[in-house]
């Protein structure tokens, strides 16, 4: 068996990725989120598959098919709420995973990082089209508002929006194609995740010290496989607590009203995990400018490796940049809060200041502080 593990063409790949993989001996629980994202993806694909067996992607029956899943299908309510809250958990893990990468300088592995940014865009697209499927008020109006943003693209905008809609408004054709996209994209995510791992295993994992860990590696199994299992159980506990006690905590009550094109909800807002980007979009009083800022708020992650100025990889021994990092985290939380507030003062000005600070920190303040710390090292 031992020999088969190392010689069999298929088992050999698994062995090199999850069993005999040389791993730094000092990686903390912040390194658990990669495997937790894999767990989230598996949960989402499985629950999504069972939901798709009962869901109908037609405007006249979509809303009632979701109600039917919750009322009549065996444990349908459990599957539906695990899928809905699983998405929130997915994004929670993504944000912590990216935060870890920023803090410990994992972005210096540029291929892995860039594939990660592509993964983030794909997951965001999947979540967006998925939110439209229950065909409630917020589903319909969210789809209308967000797809409408593309009309800001000069010359081709209007044509592009009508092409995506499959008509002159969000309707039956839109819902059907969004269901198709929502079904296929998770498999694209799975493929990208494999490439993400492929590039990661070319260089090996980073570690909290940011130093080369080649002299001190241990096998992934049993050490980190068991450590990952602990993370799995804790995460499943959090998910089940959310699903069984407060399943609607993170949802919008408006989505329990069937979609009605003739009645606009008082506050159109996306799910909590998009609120920071939504706040940046709304902070610019120009449509095209807002769309560009929205895309830039995520795309800016591509620039992070290029803006690394410090002699040190992570922030473990850089107190000044550490302070700026936590200001960035606070700023993102502020943007998330603002995204859920109505467009009125003082929220408008707070959102604009938080948006400016967000871009300023990443592009200017953190790189300059890195240079300052380099000089301080020479004292």
UniProtKB/Swiss-Prot annotation:
Binds 2 heme b groups non-covalently. One of its GO terms (biological process) is mitochondrial electron transport, ubiquinol to cytochrome c. Heme b b566 binds at residues 97, 196. InterPro entries: Cyt_b/b6_C, Cyt_b/b6_C_sf, Cyt_b/b6_N, Cytb/b6-like_sf, Cytochrome_b, Cytochrome_b_C_euk/bac, Cytochrome_b_N_euk/bac, Di-haem_cyt_TM. GO terms for cellular component: membrane; mitochondrial inner membrane; respiratory chain complex III. Heme b b562 binds at residues 83, 182. It is found in: Mitochondrion inner membrane. The chain crosses the membrane at residues 33-53, 77-98, 113-133, 178-198, 226-246, 288-308, 320-340, 347-367. Component of the ubiquinol-cytochrome c reductase complex (complex III or cytochrome b-c1 complex) that is part of the mitochondrial respiratory chain. The b-c1 complex mediates electron transfer from ubiquinol to cytochrome c. Contributes to the generation of a proton gradient across the mitochondrial membrane that is then used for ATP synthesis. Heme 1 (or BL or b562) is low-potential and absorbs at about 562 nm, and heme 2 (or BH or b566) is high-potential and absorbs at about 566 nm. This is Cytochrome b. It comes from Ornithorhynchus anatinus.
């Amino acid at each position: 068996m031992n020999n088969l593990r190392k010689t069999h063409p298929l088992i050999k790949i698994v062995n090199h990725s999850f069993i005999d993989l040389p791993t730094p001996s000092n990686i903390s629980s912040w390194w658990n989120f990669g495997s937790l994202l894999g767990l989230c993806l598996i949960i989402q694909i499985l629950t999504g598959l069972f939901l798709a067996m009962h869901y109908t992607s037609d405007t006249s029956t979509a809303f009632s098919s979701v109600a039917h899943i919750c009322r009549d299908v065996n444990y349908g309510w459990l599957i539906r709420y695990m899928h809905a809250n699983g998405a929130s958990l997915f994004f929670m893990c993504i944000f912590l995973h990216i935060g870890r990468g920023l803090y410990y300088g994992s972005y210096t592995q540029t291929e892995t990082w860039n594939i990660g940014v592509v993964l983030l865009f794909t997951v965001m697209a999947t979540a967006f089209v998925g939110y439209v499927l229950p065909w409630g008020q917020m589903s319909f109006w969210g789809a209308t508002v967000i797809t409408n943003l593309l009309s800001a693209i000069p010359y081709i905008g209007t044509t592009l929006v009508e092409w995506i809609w499959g008509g002159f408004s969000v309707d039956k054709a839109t819902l059907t194609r969004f269901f198709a996209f929502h079904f296929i994209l998770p498999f694209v995510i799975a493929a990208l995740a494999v490439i993400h791992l492929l590039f990661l295993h070319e260089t090996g994992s980073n570690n909290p010290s940011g130093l080369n860990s080649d002299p001190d590696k241990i096998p992934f199994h049993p050490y980190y496989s068991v450590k990952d299992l602990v993370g799995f159980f804790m995460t499943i506990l959090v998910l089940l607590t959310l699903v069984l006690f407060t399943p609607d905590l993170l949802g919008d009550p408006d989505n329990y009203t069937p979609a009605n094109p003739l009645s606009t909800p008082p506050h159109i807002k996306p799910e909590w995990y998009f609120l920071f980007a939504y706040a940046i979009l709304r902070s610019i009083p120009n449509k095209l400018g807002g769309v560009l800022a929205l895309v830039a708020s995520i795309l800016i992650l591509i620039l992070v490796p290029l803006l690394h100025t410090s002699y040190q990889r992570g922030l473990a021994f850089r107190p000044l940049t550490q302070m700026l990092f936590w200001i960035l985290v606070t700023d993102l939380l502020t943007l998330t809060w603002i995204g859920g507030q109505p467009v009125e003062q003082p929220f408008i000005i707070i959102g604009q200041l938080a948006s400016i600070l967000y871009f300023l920190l990443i592009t200017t303040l953190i790189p300059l502080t890195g240079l300052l710390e380099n000089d301080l090292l020479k004292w």
